[in-house]
Amino acid sequence: MRAWLLLLAVLATFQTIVRVASTEDISQRFIAAIAPVAAEIPLASASGSGSGPGRSGSRSGGASTSTALAKAFNPFSEPASFSDSDKSHRSKTNKKPSKSDANRQFNEVHKPRTGQLENSKNKSKQLVNKPNHNNHNKMAVKEQRSHHKKSHHHRSHQPKQASASTESHQSSSIESIFVEEPTLVLDREVASINVPANAKAIIAEQGPSTYSKEALIKDKLKPDPSTLVEIEKSLLSLFNMKRPPKIDRSKIIIPEPMKKLYAEIMGHELDSVNIPKPGLLTKSANTVRSFTHKDSKIDDRFPHHHRFRLHFDVKSIPADEKLKAAELQLTRDALSPQVVASRSSANRTRYQVLVYDITRVGVRGQREPSYLLLDTKTVRLNSTDTVSLDVQPAVDRWLASPQRNYGLLVEVRTVRSLKPAPHHHVRLRRSADEAHERWQHKQPLLFTYTDDGRHKARSIRDVSGGEGGGKGGRNKRQPRRPTRRKNHDDTCRRHSLYVDFSDVGWDDWIVAPLGYDAYYCHGKCPFPLADHFNSTNHAVVQTLVNNMNPGKVPKACCVPTQLDSVAMLYLNDQSTVVLKNYQEMTVVGCGCR
């Protein structure tokens, strides 16, 4: 009904204009303009007849009619005026304008505007076609939604008509306006969105549907430089170093005894940080260093294979470390069975190895050098085992007075006659025709066992006991009672935490391990505390009070209850191979304390 009233009002207004203008041409144009609207009015009114739900349909029909009328008077869809020459021509001919003429006149009147639309359209296409890798993914999704929404909006508001070329042309013009213009706005919106740089390759390879956070963190994330600096400082303090060593790893050979000792430490569960060494008092020693002989001109004074001077530079041992043991290791070459058989006598098949500390050098023509016998060993010719000699007194003297380090003198002789050994069995020096690489595995080595004093007096099994009298008083070798433990992921337990030395660029001087699992403790300590939480009596009482009055005391904390040491094999600035057992480096067990 409202639509009819609105139409009558428009007709009345038009009649007034016709009387004033006195022209038939304008009337005909108006009728042609509102013809599509009139075609829709019966449908709208029909849907609005009746009561109940039909009333809502009437309101919607009126809204559609109003929209259609507004589009009929839209300056983009109907000519606003005509020229005087055109009106006089139509008055003289007294002809009804055809649809082709109306279409031609519409194009002439709106030619400037159409040109502007074409320019805007071209600019829009340039912006859309311009490659924008950062925003390509989100633009595609927004453009599809925007185009679908605008197409639906255009179809719902487009007036129904049988066939008219004028309406078809203006429909395409309106579509070009309401489709191209939002594309410009869309491009400006998406241009302000920052997409991570490493997302470009992911979007290009896998497409927009796989662009996710998991894809971005597929590669290993590296800490930022400032974090790496702090990590490096902390590790250097832990290793008791001022700076990481700068060495050429390719020129250094790791001695086989050091490798075997490292494997022995890592392959056995130790009760403390002490490094065991059969035959030596290495109690509380946590650091082992290996030294090689330093060549000098003095070597030429000992041309024979049975007597040689060895010099080791031990200045790299820190002054705050206490020497626990020192040994000289000599390798032996296997002799042929014919040589061993030719020396059938028991005394002739055994050699004696002696090592002296050179306490004073000699002066030619004035005094003889002074020697102090340190150790002696008897070896058999049919064996190739390493010979170990105790030289701790000499190393102690060198550490106290580095300028009086004159080296060690080693002699190999027969047991019975005490004559020089006739065969090149115990290796003291390099042969003239021997390759350098082979000699590096055969050369004499000095091993020092020191204690840096940084570890606590108690062992690892004492740490597991925690506070005396608690439930955690068991040592880690004592078997535990079987307990039925529920799988609660949020309760106190041990979690993995892998430390990779390559993250700080230390894999060039750390021989082994390249990384280790330090673990950490995390989780809740619920009330009541079960036996598997390895809690102390104090933790039980604290948890009980917290359950009664949470604001008075906090809950017990999930902390490490057992810690173990980690052995590391690395090189220092002097290219010395160091084997060190670091205390409390990895978590063995967790509990509520």
Swiss-Prot record:
For molecular function, the Gene Ontology terms on record are: cytokine activity; growth factor activity
Which residues belong to the propeptide? Answer: 16-461
Protein's GO biological process: cell differentiation
Residue spans of biased composition, Polar residues class: 125-134
Which InterPro entries does the UniProt entry name for this protein?
Answer: Cystine-knot_cytokine, TGF-b_C, TGF-b_propeptide, TGF-beta-rel, TGFb_CS
Stretches for region Disordered: 45-174, 459-489
Q: Return the PROSITE patterns for the record.
A: TGF_BETA_1, TGF_BETA_2
Q: Which UniProt keywords apply?
A: Developmental protein, Differentiation, Disulfide bond, Glycoprotein, Growth factor, Secreted, Signal
Give the protein's recorded name.
Protein decapentaplegic
